[in-house]
Design a protein with these regions (language model features):
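Conserved binding/catalytic microenvironments
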Residues: 1-183
Length: 183
């Protein structure tokens, strides 16, 4: 997102000027969000990425290889393909740390993440830490009766500081079962 902040600041500011923020901090958070979205859209352009996703039936590893992106970047981008007239499968995306805290989330589905507390302990995203490098699949049903196909996998990120431990997360990607035939 640093590149977006450095090269697209005028565009970001013009977009932010269209909104009414209650605090300067809220505006700053929104600016980072826009810069992150810009970065993802630059790395994984909408139409080319959407076509590739359909072509390989949304295979996260193949998409990551094809676009030189991480599994997490690919999963997150899939959850944002909701442009009017060119919508992709409505996916949800989640990233959790080893304590079970949701650290990143996005949903184009009816699934709503809890604002407080943890996610269901039976959800496969929690078991992903036990099977490094492997995708876990799960059929899950929410209390409102909606059924989801859920994928989960562990991911690691360098901490950045000298000798700092590697940060481990699990990512989850899912869609309503009615879309499973497209995967």
């Amino acid at each position: 997102h640093q590149l977006a902040l450095a090269t697209q600041n005028d565009l970001l500011e013009a977009t932010l000027d269209l909104a009414r923020f209650s605090t300067p901090e809220a505006r700053d958070i929104a600016k980072i969000g826009l810069a992150n979205y810009f970065a993802g859209a630059s790395l994984l352009p909408y139409r080319a990425f959407q076509e590739a996703a359909k072509e390989c039936r949304h295979d996260l590893e193949r998409l990551a290889d094809r676009f030189g992106a991480s599994i997490e970047q690919v999963a997150h981008r899939l959850s944002t393909l909701q442009r009017p007239g060119a919508k992709g499968i409505p996916f949800f995306f989640v990233r959790v740390d080893q304590a079970g805290t949701i650290t990143k989330r996005h949903s184009a589905t009816r699934l709503q993440f809890a604002r407080f507390g943890g996610a269901c302990p039976l959800w496969n995203v929690h078991a992903a830490f036990e099977t490094p490098g492997k995708f876990l699949r799960q059929l899950a049903e929410t209390p409102d009766g909606v059924r989801y196909l859920c994928l989960a996998r562990d991911v690691s990120k360098p901490a950045g500081a000298w000798r700092a431990p590697v940060r481990r997360y699990a990512i989850g990607l899912g869609c309503e079962v009615q879309h499973a035939a497209e995967l």
